[in-house]
């Protein structure tokens, strides 16, 4: 099977990419493309269940695995739920900051996985061509109290990553 040659991640995994790759003894680094605080547009307001005047972090990062472009992430997080987020956290692990420093814990996530045509941004940062498809994983992550803490879109090259899901039927 050709997918065996790709990195496969469980679709229901919540530890984050840093922990996944540390377990596999892989070198994961990050490049910050954008890190701003802004007011959310109506789409982000709906996804994060916040008002128009509640600021969010707007984060664009390139995840680099073993010195190769791996995932292009665009993440929004409400500032009031993630106070004190700094570039140092973006360069290490945002999820470690949430779990260890802020004592926040996830209840689950809604994920939508689809194929898409590569954008100019994908081509620039993931080194793919304009005819290469990308795997787009959009997710909303929820805290245990039900509040959405993250909306993100992760763009993956078609030839380097996929996701698996074990679907067990219950009677």
Q: Where are the regions a protein language model picked out?
A:
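A generic local secondary-structure boundary/capping motif
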Residues: 46-49, 60, 124-126
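GIY-YIG-like beta-to-alpha core
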Residues: 77-78
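C-terminal effector-binding regulatory domain of bacterial HTH transcription factors
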Residues: 145-171
């Amino acid at each position: 099977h050709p997918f065996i040659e790709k990195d496969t991640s469980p679709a229901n995994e919540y530890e984050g990419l840093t922990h996944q790759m540390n377990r596999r003894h892989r070198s994961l680094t990050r490049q910050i493309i954008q890190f701003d605080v802004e007011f959310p547009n109506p789409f982000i307001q709906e996804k994060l269940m916040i008002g128009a005047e509640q600021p969010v972090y707007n984060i664009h990062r390139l995840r680099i695995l073993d010195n190769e472009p791996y995932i292009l992430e665009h993440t929004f997080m409400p500032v009031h739920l993630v106070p004190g987020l700094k570039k140092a956290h973006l360069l290490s692990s945002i999820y470690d900051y949430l779990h260890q420093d802020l004592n926040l814990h996830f209840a689950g996530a809604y994920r939508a996985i689809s194929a898409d045509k590569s954008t100019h941004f994908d081509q620039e940062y993931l080194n793919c061509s304009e005819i290469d498809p990308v795997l787009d994983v959009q997710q909303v992550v929820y805290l245990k109290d039900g509040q959405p803490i993250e909306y993100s879109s992760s763009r993956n090259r078609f030839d380097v990553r996929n996701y698996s899901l074990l679907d067990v039927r219950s009677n």
